[in-house]
Curated annotation (Swiss-Prot):
<feature type="transmembrane region" description="Helical">
    <location>
        <begin position="60"/>
        <end position="80"/>
    </location>
</feature>
<feature type="topological domain" description="Periplasmic">
    <location>
        <begin position="81"/>
        <end position="477"/>
    </location>
</feature>
<dbReference type="GO" id="GO:0009306">
    <property type="term" value="P:protein secretion"/>
</dbReference>
<feature type="topological domain" description="Cytoplasmic">
    <location>
        <begin position="1"/>
        <end position="59"/>
    </location>
</feature>
<keyword id="KW-0354">Hemolysis</keyword>
<keyword id="KW-0204">Cytolysis</keyword>
<keyword id="KW-1003">Cell membrane</keyword>
<dbReference type="GO" id="GO:0031640">
    <property type="term" value="P:killing of cells of another organism"/>
</dbReference>
<dbReference type="InterPro" id="IPR006144">
    <property type="entry name" value="Secretion_HlyD_CS"/>
</dbReference>
<keyword id="KW-0472">Membrane</keyword>
<dbReference type="InterPro" id="IPR050739">
    <property type="entry name" value="MFP"/>
</dbReference>
<keyword id="KW-0812">Transmembrane</keyword>
<comment type="function">
    <text>Involved in the transport of the toxin RTX-I as well as that of RTX-II.</text>
</comment>
<protein>
    <recommendedName>
        <fullName>RTX-I toxin determinant D</fullName>
    </recommendedName>
</protein>
<keyword id="KW-0813">Transport</keyword>
<keyword id="KW-1133">Transmembrane helix</keyword>
<dbReference type="Pfam" id="PF13437">
    <property type="entry name" value="HlyD_3"/>
</dbReference>
Length: 477
């Protein structure tokens, strides 16, 4: 071990001695200074030694290689965003209220101005539906007449039950719209119908009384011939006894027997007549009852029809009243309204938007149309950059948002073809100008939404054309 250390020491000591001696004569070893012309006349290998090539080209080459290396590293490490562009516009969320008429109407009065702040239930417009007033007046008149008719039939039913005409009162509130002429007509009809029924009933009752009198006459004749037949029978018995004792002739017996037979026959005739009269009495009573039943049934049937008609007219009147109420438009919520009709006396059509009322807490959203080629890469929750076309984003900036909803049912667009509707929420509804002022955004402004669907490396982006060319090469159509 000691020998090895000694050898190492002597080795370094020898190098030290050589270096020291050379250091002493270092000035003698330097190349003498020569002029440029002298260097040019030296041999080629000495010229290269004395005047070596400049290091700048080599340095530039190294720098280029370093730049290419760094560019390669950056292209591998760095990533670019993949975005899908969708066009659309700013719009209020579904809480905005569109005011529309339910039918064609005329603008009678306008109580607000465009952009005015309104309170809930504040009067906005007064419309006049075409023919609504006339329809309502006609329905009221028809309903009033129907109520009078119903009262008429109800009074007649009471009169039939009581067999006398009750007091007719037409002063109730339900008859306040009826005219005096209609009331007089109803009183006349009630009295006329009741008296007509009473006359028919009286005629049948007279017929019944005649049948009753006829019955009494028949009964009297029956009693008469019952007594007469008994007397004639006793006489016949007595004459037969006398004939047996030879005290009278046979002719007297036969005569008496004939009288007895006549009395019995008359009694049988009147008894048969009694059955006929009793049948006529029953028929007369049934006719009296039938007249009352038919009269009552007719009244009930007409009353039923009248009640149904009254229900229909009440519904029609309610419908007309709703039309009148709907013609007076009030604010459903409070905040600013956008008036779209300004002409008093102008005509508005069914479902035409008259104004839009935006609640105070309403928010702006982006309604964008996603093209068919991009829909497969877009999901709810993805970030989006919103650029408002009205305000260049280089000066006013842009909005940030997120995809809120996507409708997976394609719609046909005349320029874009099949597109899908989407809603993108935004972080704010103002843009900042260069002077620092906040610019309020409004509904209807056109925007472009750049939806971030993913990332890819720069090298992948640069090589994608080559990759596509390679994948499509070596093929024959």
């Amino acid at each position: 071990m000691k020998t090895w250390l000694m050898g190492l020491y002597e080795f370094f000591q020898a190098y030290k001695t050589v270096w020291t001696e050379i250091w002493k004569i270092r000035h003698q070893l330097d190349t003498p200074d020569r002029e440029k012309d002298e260097n040019e006349f030296l041999p080629a290998h000495l010229e290269l030694i004395e005047t070596p090539v400049s290091k700048k080209p080599r340095l530039i080459a190294y720098l280029i290689m370093l730049f290419l290396f760094l560019a390669l590293v950056i292209s591998i490490v760095s990533h670019v965003e993949i975005v899908a562009t969708a066009t659309g516009k700013l719009a209020f969320s579904g809480r905005s209220k569109e005011i529309k008429p339910i039918e064609n109407a005329l603008v009678k009065e306008i109580f607000v101005e465009d952009g005015q702040f309104v309170e809930k239930d504040q009067l906005l417009l007064h419309l006049t539906a075409l023919g609504a007033d006339a329809d309502q007046q006609k329905t009221k008149s028809s309903l009033s007449l129907t109520k009078l008719e119903r009262y008429r039939y109800e009074i007649l039913l009471e009169a039939v039950a009581a067999d006398r005409l009750p007091l007719i009162e037409l002063t109730k509130d339900e008859f306040k719209h009826a005219t005096e002429e209609d009331k007089t007509r109803i009183r006349y009809l009630i009295t006329e119908q009741f008296e007509a029924w009473q006359k028919q009933k009286y005629q049948k009752e007279l017929a019944l009384q005649r049948r009753e009198a006829e019955k009494q006459t028949v009964l009297a004749n029956i009693r008469k011939y019952e007594g007469s037949s008994r007397v004639e029978n006793e006489r016949l018995k007595d004459l037969k006894k006398l004939f047996n004792s030879k005290s009278t002739s046979k002719h007297d017996v036969l005569t008496q027997e004939n009288r007895h037979i006549e009395a019995v026959n008359e009694l049988a005739v009147y008894k048969s007549r009694l059955n006929e009269v009793e049948s006529d009495l029953r028929q007369a009573k049934e006719e009296i009852h039938l007249i009352t039943q038919l009269f009552r049934a007719d009244i009930l049937e007409k009353l039923k029809q009248n009640v149904e008609a009254e229900k229909q007219l009440s519904l029609e009147l309610e419908k007309n009243e709703q039309r009148q109420i709907a013609s007076v438009i009030r604010a459903p919520v409070s905040y600013v309204q956008q008036l779209k009709t300004h002409t008093v006396g102008g005509v508005v059509t069914t479902a035409e938007t008259l104004m839009v009322i935006a609640p105070e807490d309403d928010v702006l959203e982006v309604t964008a149309l996603i093209q068919n080629k991009d829909i497969g890469f877009i999901e709810v929750g993805q970030d989006a950059v919103i650029k408002v076309e009205t305000f260049p984003y280089t000066r006013y900036g842009y909005l940030m948002g997120k995809v809120k909803n996507i409708t997976l049912e394609a719609i046909e667009h005349p320029q874009l073809g099949l597109v899908f509707n989407s809603i993108i929420s935004i972080d704010r509804k103002t843009l900042s100008g260069k002077d620092g002022k906040e610019i309020e955004l409004g509904s209807g402004m056109s925007v472009t939404a750049e939806i971030k669907t993913g990332e890819r490396s720069v090298i992948s982006y640069l090589l994608s054309p080559l990759e596509e060319s390679v994948s499509e090469s070596l093929r024959e159509r």
